[in-house]
């Protein structure tokens, strides 16, 4: 058995700290890492997000300029609606040069507070902004990750999340899921626990399971893929069998 002091420490780190970090929206301290399988929705369609959020299984949202454009709405109206819905982690992408991204990131962080994760590209300017924001305990999601070296630089810049693009890597004849595995192995061998791997550009249900298997901490997926995670032909057959048997039982008792 663990000594009482050790038990108390374990309880603090495994139970109390995750609750505090989740409620306040702050990044855990460097010595602590609470690993879990989190699912984000990758969309700016608030109706689809509401449907997903109502399941109780969605942990956050990722957006980008393309998704916002498709929604046809003002981005900050979308962000506010998501926060009002109850979502506590919304990735808000900034664009421009270093100064423009930093100023916009600070403005969004000041406006939306602990609910905002500022999304920057993996470029010299983007990582410089990541460094500046993370020093102020602002969550940063570094996007457009296509290599382990980019994930290393992003981690050193203080990224909360790195977003490897699984589907786009596959499109270019490379192994997108293998990239997840390589980043996870690199972080593990270096005992790096401050940056979570957020698998992005996921296009199929099977890839969600494989991404988690290969070491992703989070998968951000389109609503269609999320809904497809429930489905399996054997589940349907089993339900049909149970339904027919239950009807037979009811007839016996009639």
Which role fits each region the language model picked out?
Residues 40-41, 45-49, 55, 63-132:
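Active-site beta->alpha loop and helix N-cap motifs at the rims of alpha/beta catalytic domains
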Residues 65-68, 162-172, 217-235:
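Glycine-rich phosphate-binding active-site loops on the catalytic face of alpha/beta enzymes
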Residues 64, 118, 154, 211, ...:
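Conserved, mostly hydrophobic/aromatic
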